Amino acid sequence: MAFAFPDSFRFADSHEYANADGELVRVGISAFAVDQLGDIVFVDLPDVGASLAKGTSFGSVESVKAVEDMYAPIAGEVVQRNEAVLASPEELQNDPHGEGWLLVLRPSDPAELDSLMTAEAYGAKVNAG
């Protein structure tokens, strides 16, 4: 199965995405990662106000197959978390690049987005294998 990713998204090697929206950045996990996990039963996210360092764990996603940590693709402060996904983890599974987003961050350094893979590069990586 080939996956398509929104052109505006940037991706970390660990399958999290960052999508800039003005001064804020929406963070989630890719459709590829969701597909690999299978049926998602629980999502754990940090509280609003938490400060995240790039590459550090910010929560976990539990499926019937595994529990996987999620890592911050950029550094920043959590300004919003998706309560709908916490209440109904299947939202993440149904629309990971849309309604299934996880966090909104105020980035510490917006230039960090440039260090992430483009949608094209990420797509080539995950679809190759």
Curated annotation (Swiss-Prot):
Residue numbers carrying N6-lipoyllysine: K65
Assigned protein family: Belongs to the GcvH family.
PROSITE patterns linked: BIOTINYL_LIPOYL (PS50968), LIPOYL (PS00189)
Biological process per Gene Ontology, one example term: glycine decarboxylation via glycine cleavage system
Physiological role: The glycine cleavage system catalyzes the degradation of glycine. The H protein shuttles the methylamine group of glycine from the P protein to the T protein.
Cited HAMAP family: GcvH
Keywords: Lipoyl
Residue span(s) of domain Lipoyl-binding: 24-106
Domain of life according to the entry: Bacteria
Keyword Thylakoid part of the UniProt annotation: no
Subunit (UniProt): The glycine cleavage system is composed of four proteins: P, T, L and H.
Family matches, as SUPFAM superfamilies: Single hybrid motif
Official protein name in the record: Glycine cleavage system H protein
GO CC annotation terms, alphabetical: cytosol; glycine cleavage complex
NCBIfam families recorded: gcvH, PRK01202.1
Signal peptide positions on this chain: none
Cofactor stoichiometry and binding remark: Binds 1 lipoyl cofactor covalently.
Cofactor section: (R)-lipoate
Organism: Synechococcus sp. (strain CC9605)
